[in-house]
Swiss-Prot record:
Job description of the protein: Associates with the EF-Tu.GDP complex and induces the exchange of GDP to GTP. It remains bound to the aminoacyl-tRNA.EF-Tu.GTP complex up to the GTP hydrolysis stage on the ribosome.
Protein name according to UniProt: Elongation factor Ts
UniProt superkingdom: Bacteria
Record's subcellular location: Cytoplasm
Record family assignment: Belongs to the EF-Ts family.
Keyword entries, A-Z: Cytoplasm, Elongation factor, Protein biosynthesis
Keyword Cytoplasm listed: yes
A cellular component annotation (GO) from this entry: cytoplasm
Pfam families to which the protein is assigned, alphabetical: EF_TS
The organism of origin for this protein: Orientia tsutsugamushi (strain Boryong) (Rickettsia tsutsugamushi)
InterPro entries: EF-Ts_dimer_sf, Transl_elong_EFTs/EF1B, Transl_elong_EFTs/EF1B_dimer, UBA-like_sf
Gene that this polypeptide is encoded by: tsf
Keyword Disulfide bond: no
GO molecular function ontology, one term from the record: translation elongation factor activity
Ranges where the record places region Involved in Mg(2+) ion dislocation from EF-Tu: 98-101
């Protein structure tokens, strides 16, 4: 079957014009190389008379002129990437406007290199100013990619998890599109005087649990009093609509606060693997089996594109 072709009229001499044939495969090739929209690729190839390299320059020139407006557009899609190096792990989120860009191989490589840089730079300002292997800063490279792709791209969040004593940094990627790259990224610092390979399976399972339950806090002690008070106010307002006696309402509020902690505190959550054993008990059972105290000292979970309050 003959490939479809686009016939483009391009002025060459005065009012004369000649037809430049641009194949669909050429448009797709430019799209794969840049991540730009099909329409933009077609227009760029039209202006460049079918020359791929010139078309990339056209895309950059056109999109640079529109850069200010692009940076104001919402970027709701994204990917998260993680990196682990001995006693430290890092996660970064890069947001785009469409999920197509998230599948762009060049942007995926950029995200993975940015995650490696995040092992050293623990805040967005330093990370954006850090230099990539190309010699460009991360911020500069992203500006260039915006110019080519034509979408707003943002490095939006960064997280680090560190070990203090012996242990491992366990990791998990959900909906992976490439190694250490996907839609949900989790890091867990698991400490104990145990051979690292014996902690690996436990750490992986806990990381998967975190991806499924997205806890907000590690322990009940870490929940701010302001959060508890806010939840109590909500529960109190709900309970009073029942018209029940004050003592009954107090018991209802206590029960709802306990349930809130069970849902949001990692150590209080029921392990997703069996649905009943608390994570704190999972650690205790593992400690008995391995002959050493095992504790979670930190964790982080980022979901690509989530709305952060």
């Amino acid at each position: 079957m003959k490939e479809k072709e686009l016939v483009v009229n391009t002025k060459t001499n005065g009012s004369k014009s000649e037809d430049v044939i641009i194949s669909i495969s050429l448009v797709k090739k430019l799209r794969d190389a840049t991540g730009a929209a099909m329409t933009s690729c077609k227009q760029a190839l039209q202006e460049a008379k079918g020359d791929i390299e010139e078309a990339i320059k056209v895309l950059r020139k056109t999109n640079l002129a529109q850069m200010s407006s692009k940076l104001q557009r919402k970027a709701d899609e994204g990917i998260v990437a993680l990196a682990v190096d001995n006693n430290k792990g890092a996660i970064i989120e890069i947001k785009f406007e469409t999920d197509f860009v998230a599948r762009n191989e060049r942007l995926q490589k950029l995200a993975m290199e940015a995650a490696q840089l995040a092992l050293v730079h623990d805040n967005l300002t330093d990370l954006k100013n850090a230099k990539l292997s190309s010699g460009e800063t991360l911020e500069s490279q992203i500006s260039q990619d915006i110019a080519v792709i034509g979408e707003n791209i943002q490095v939006s969040r960064i997280r680090q998890v560190k070990l203090v004593d012996n242990g491992i940094i366990a990791s998990y990627i959900h909906n992976s599109v490439a190694p250490n790259l996907g839609q949900i990224a989790v890091l867990v610092a698991l400490e104990g005087n145990v051979e690292s390979d014996k902690l690996t399976k436990l750490g992986k399972n806990i990381a998967m649990h975190i991806a499924a339950t997205n806890p907000r806090f590690l322990s009940s002690n870490e929940v701010p009093e302001s959060v508890i008070m806010q939840e109590k106010e909500i529960f109190t307002a709900q309970a009073r609509t029942t018209g029940k006696p004050e003592k009954v309402i107090e018991k209802m509020i206590e029960g709802r606060v306990s349930k809130f902690l069970e849902e949001t505190v990692l150590l209080e959550q029921a392990f997703v693997i069996d649905g009943k054993t608390k994570i704190s008990e999972v650690l205790s059972n593992a400690a008995k089996e391995l002959g050493s105290e095992i504790k979670i000292t930190g964790f982080s979970c980022l979901k690509a594109g989530e709305v952060v309050e």
